[in-house]
């Protein structure tokens, strides 16, 4: 009887070990795979290589998610504005109506504001149903969680250099044009990683588009790959690959992230750290909407104040 129990335990441990190892697998080859129109099976196989993949995504969501339609129908709903120059301790988002947010982004002289983390906006406007009905081709097998986001940006603005921990991570351009700069996980040691467990964000303090003097030596040790995406193109970025999105034109990006049951188990320590962080940290965002009463001023500067 004891032998049988020990054997069952061994099989369970072996099963978990193999699946967790598979989930945490990385690939450091600095190249991107381009496919015209992959089948569902081909996409799954190639994604498991853990290399970036670029392909065309012909889907109705491309004709629905654009500035004109959202401005006409959902301009009163709040999106979240982020100052990408803020440090970890002030990593919060400012809610503004879509109309106000677009004005801010358009007139931001310093190009330091972007819009992301807009799950609430998608839910309140019911646009999340469009995402949910358009991503069956992208969803991996045994998916446990789907995370959707909407990113907005104007020319010359860009996101932080960061990575994601989920099993699948796709970015679809539905309007405009962007450049994505990528580097594989092996370069993490040169990127001065900042972990914000409260929102599960893992970003580099290095500005990959305008490298600070103090990081020049580290930057010279890494190699990056730039890829341009236009409307209708989608890219898969593997977990732990650093990426930054720079907007060439006024653009909207749909972000699809997926976690499977085994992926959730593999990154369980990150969720535990998030619980601890949220229990020990209390932050309050002050109401500063009055700061943008004159959005067309020469120099727009919104501060994220935390008490």
What residue ranges belong to the model's regions?
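N-terminal accessory scaffold of Fe(II)-dependent oxygenases
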Residues: 1-234, 242-307
């Amino acid at each position: 009887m004891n032998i049988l129990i020990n054997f069952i335990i061994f099989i369970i441990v072996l099963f978990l070990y193999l699946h967790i190892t598979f989930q945490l697998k990385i690939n450091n080859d600095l190249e991107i795979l381009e496919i015209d129109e992959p089948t569902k099976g081909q996409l799954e196989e190639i994604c498991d290589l853990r290399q970036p993949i670029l392909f065309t995504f012909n889907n109705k969501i491309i004709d629905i998610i654009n500035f004109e339609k959202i401005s006409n129908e959902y301009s009163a709903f709040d999106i979240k504005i982020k100052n990408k120059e803020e440090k970890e301790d002030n990593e919060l988002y400012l809610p503004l109506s879509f109309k106000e947010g677009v004005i801010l982004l358009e007139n931001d002289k310093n190009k330091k504001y972007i819009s992301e983390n807009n799950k609430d906006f998608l839910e309140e406007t019911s646009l999340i149903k469009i995402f949910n009905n358009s991503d069956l081709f992208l969803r991996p097998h045994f998916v446990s969680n789907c995370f959707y986001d909407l990113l907005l940006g104007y020319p010359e603005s860009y996101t932080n250099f960061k990575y994601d921990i989920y099993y699948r991570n796709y970015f679809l351009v539905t309007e405009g044009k962007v450049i994505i700069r990528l580097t594989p996980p092996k370069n993490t040691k040169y990127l001065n990683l900042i972990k914000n467990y409260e929102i599960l964000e893992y970003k580099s303090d290095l500005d990959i588009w305008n490298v600070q003097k103090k990081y020049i030596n580290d930057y010279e040790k890494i190699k990056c790959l730039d890829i341009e995406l236009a409307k209708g193109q989608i890219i898969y970025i593997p977990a732990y690959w650093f990426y930054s999105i720079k907007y060439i034109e006024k653009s909207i990006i749909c972000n699809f992230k997926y976690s499977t049951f085994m992926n959730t188990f593999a990154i369980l320590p990150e969720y535990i750290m998030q619980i601890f962080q949220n229990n020990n940290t209390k932050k309050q965002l002050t109401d500063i909407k009055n700061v943008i009463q004159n959005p067309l001023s020469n120099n727009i500067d919104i501060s994220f104040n935390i008490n």
